Amino acid sequence: MQIEWLILLLPLAAASGWYAASRAARKESAKSEREANPVYFQGLNYLLNEEPDKAIDVFLEMLEVDADTIETHLALGNLFRRRGEVERAIRIHQNLIARPALSREQRAQAVLELAQDYMRSGLYDRAEQLLLELKQGRQYVVPVLRNLVKIYQQEKDWDACLKTIEALDIESGETHDLQKSHYFCEMANKARADGDNEVARIYLKRALNVYKGCVRATHLLARIDIQENKRKDALVKLLDAAERAPEYLPEIIREIVDIYRSEGDMRGVRTFLEDQVKRHPNQGTELFLAEIIRQQSGDAEATRFLGEYIAKNPSMPGLIRLVELQCTMPSMGNDHLLYNVRAHLHRLMSERINYQCQKGGFEAKQLHWQCPSCDSWSTIKRRSLIEADNQIKTVKEVL
C-alpha cells in the first residue's frame, strides 16, 4: 500500500481508538473495551491490507459525531479533497450531514465542505444548490458567496457573477471593482460576437464607470472604433490606455502604429515610439521604432540604433531583430555564424514563456485576463527585465 494512505488515515484511526478507549473508561467496563477493540483492529487491518475505503467505513462507524470528533471528520475530508480524492471527501462529508446529533452550525459547516467537494468534481449544479440553501439560512454567507462567484465564473454566467459579487461587497465590506469591470468586458465580448456593438459599448462604459483604470475596456472600445472606421477616436483611447497601463503596451502597440500609418502621420508615430522607448524599455516599442528607422534611413542606421539600445536594455526580441538586420548587411565572412545564431535565437524565443501570474505563478505564452490556475483577474503580466537578462545569458551558454 502506498505510504500516503497510511499517513492520511492515521488521524482517523487514532481518533477512533481514542474515542473507543475513552468510552470504555467512562463506563468503567472491561467488557465494553473488549467489544470496542475488535472493531478498531478490524479497521487497522483493512488499512494495512490496502483497503482504505473499508477502513474509512469502520472508523467513521466507530467515531460518533460530537464536539470532540467533528473537527477530525472535517479535517480528513478536507485533506482528501486537497489531494484530489474527492469521492472519499464526499463520503465523509455526507456521513457527517446524515448524523442527527449535529448542531445547526456543525451541519452548515459540513454542507459548505460538501459543496466544495462537488465544485472540485465539476458538479456545479449540486454545489450551487447546497450553497443557495446556506445563503437562504444566512449561514457562512461570505464563503458561500465567494464559492457561488467561482461557480458562476466557470459557467460564464456574468450577470449572476455581478449580482453575487455585489452582495459579497455588502457582506464582506470589501470592494471588487476590478473584477466587476472584467465581468462587463465579458458581457461586451458576447455582445460583439452577436454583432451588437452598441450593446457592447454600453457594457464597456459600465466597466469604466466601476473601475476607471480598466485598460481592457478601453482597448475593446478602441477596437469597436476601428471596426466602425473611427480611427482617430480609437487612437485617443489607445494612447490613454498606454499612458495608464504601460505594462500592457505590447498588447496595443501594433494597433497604435497601424492607425498612425493609416493616417499618414509618420512623424507622430516616430515621436510616440521614441518617447515610449525612453520611458518604458523592453515593451516592444523598440522593434517598431527600429523598423521605422530602417524604412526612413536604411538598415545600417536601424542596426546602429538596436545595437545601442539592447546594450542598455537587453531583450530577446531586440537581439533577434539585431541579428536579422546584421544578416542583411554586406558580407563580412561570418554569414554562416550569423544564420546559425539567428536560428538558435528563434528556437529559444519559440520556447519562451512570456507571461506569468503574479499571484500564483501560472505561466503562459499569451495574455489571459483571468488566470486559468488561480482564477484571479488582471494578475498575468509580461515577464520582467530580469527574466529577459536570464534569457540573454541562456543564449550565450547555448552558443
Indicate where each model-derived feature is located.
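Residue at a conserved register position within TPR or TPR-like alpha-solenoid repeats
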Residues: 46, 80, 118, 152, ...
